[in-house]
Amino acid sequence: CEYGPSTKPEIHPMVTSILRHFFRNGHKVYVVCLWPDGQFMAEEALDEVAVDEFGLTYGTDYVLLGFRPGNEAVVKGIVSDIRKLYTIDSRGTKVTDIPMMEGINKFEDFDFLFSGSAGFPGSIEWVQFASDPTGVPMSTGTTSIQVNEVMPYVQSGQVQGILAGMPGAAEYEALIGVKGIGTSGMDAQSVAHLVIVLFIVLGNVGYFIERSRKKKDRGY
């Protein structure tokens, strides 16, 4: 997880939808965080989906390894030897005592990567230092601002797909058939856009009425 409270409205709906999709299909989920705030975001998403919705077991169905400082150095460490970088998880449990960590030693032991990214370090570092060198496929969800930075990697095939901002989150919610924050956020955004357009129209009407009145007052 590479996002925090300020970008939660865009990224969090993507992350919860991805988790629903993964768990629905029986996949085990391993979560690491390149941002300190990302750990809190991940805990909230996992509690909401893994615990409350699916009733899954920590350490067997999902694990939160947590945050480590170092930016792209953390990504490189995960690629080469994840057990050297993560000796304990976010709860302080030794990784050797976590059932689903059995057989997990390096990045190539994973089947797929999804990066919920709001900037640096994030999706670009994952593709450059993990996915591309190892061949493990990845996709990403980013803020609307970051889309243009990541799109070249999508177009080249290095990233399998991208969820672009709140519209992307809403589209993915529709895809998996579970409407959530992304959909309601887009509804609110659409209403706000309509209100703005209405004010522009009213402003223009008022301007032309006033101009017409002034012309009449001047006698032409």
Predicted regions and their residues:
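Soluble extramembrane regions of membrane proteins in the secretory/endomembrane system
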Residues: 1-170
